């Protein structure tokens, strides 16, 4: 498969959607969380050269959810750079983290979270996956 990046996380139902009526048919939140971590781990084993996102949905279930996603095999965190005054208008699910922070606070928070799992943000590097770089280097006319 020619995949550069995957973002996946637990399904979180929203009260204003048609699927909310089926919430009783879903796995409990903690099971969805654990399943998501296992999915990240399996995907990392299957595709070691792609980018995998530790989603904010993980953090909405567990305060350290994104960190657990990183430990399971994710290697990308996506900062919320939406201006603070607009964040409340874009709530895909309840308990969305960081809606009361501005962009600078969000970036500082992410840096601290990454350090907590023994990693560091590489500000001076592009975030292209190894798979993407290799694919681009193999295209005709591309310099290696």
Model-inferred region functions:
Residues 2-144:
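Auxiliary Fe-S-binding modules of radical SAM enzymes
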């Amino acid at each position: 498969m020619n995949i550069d990046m995957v973002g996946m996380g637990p399904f979180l139902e929203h009260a204003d959607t048609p699927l909310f009526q089926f919430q009783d048919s879903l796995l409990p939140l903690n099971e969805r969380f654990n399943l998501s971590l296992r999915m990240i781990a399996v995907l990392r084993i299957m595709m070691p050269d792609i980018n995998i996102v530790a989603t904010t949905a993980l953090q909405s279930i567990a305060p350290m959810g994104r960190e657990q996603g990183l430990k399971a095999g994710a290697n990308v965190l996506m900062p919320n750079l939406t201006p603070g005054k607009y964040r409340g208008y874009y709530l895909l699910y309840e308990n969305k983290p960081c809606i009361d922070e501005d962009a600078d606070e969000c970036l500082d928070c992410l840096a601290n979270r990454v350090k907590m799992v023994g990693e560091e943000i590489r500000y001076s590097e592009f975030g292209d996956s190894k798979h993407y770089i290799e694919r681009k280097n193999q295209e005709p006319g591309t310099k290696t």
